[in-house]
């Protein structure tokens, strides 16, 4: 299915994005990252518009986002433009999401029909994280917008923490619901 293919393309694009970033080819990195971002928007839209939603797609899309963003953030930290504290907040949120998802979907009560549906705060957070990468790439291209870094970091940290808390509550509720059904 096309939406799943777009998610796989996004995962594959991560490799040249990281390589271009490490080689300080910021314009190429920016163009590749924009292409990956477009594929992210398209896969969800196509899946919903043409009723192509699937359990695989509900897992593959956020995995593609995590691979792209995590590799980008680690590389941006490595080259010295992303602070460690923000990388750690993002990492903790991702651990909460992955641990909760594994716990829920490996549970006895989950079914093949379960679809992972991201919350609004999670969608906003993903957009803000993508915007952060784009912003940092523009700074590396000397666009002259670096005076807003601290504010951008705080906005992304806040949305990431709120999204992590939202997922934490979601997984606790789902776990309690599973336990009460036993």
Predicted regions: what they are:
Residues 4, 15-17, 63:
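Hydrophobic residues in alpha-helical membrane-spanning segments
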Residues 31, 63-182:
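A feature for the membrane-embedded catalytic helix bundles of lipid/isoprenoid biosynthetic enzymes
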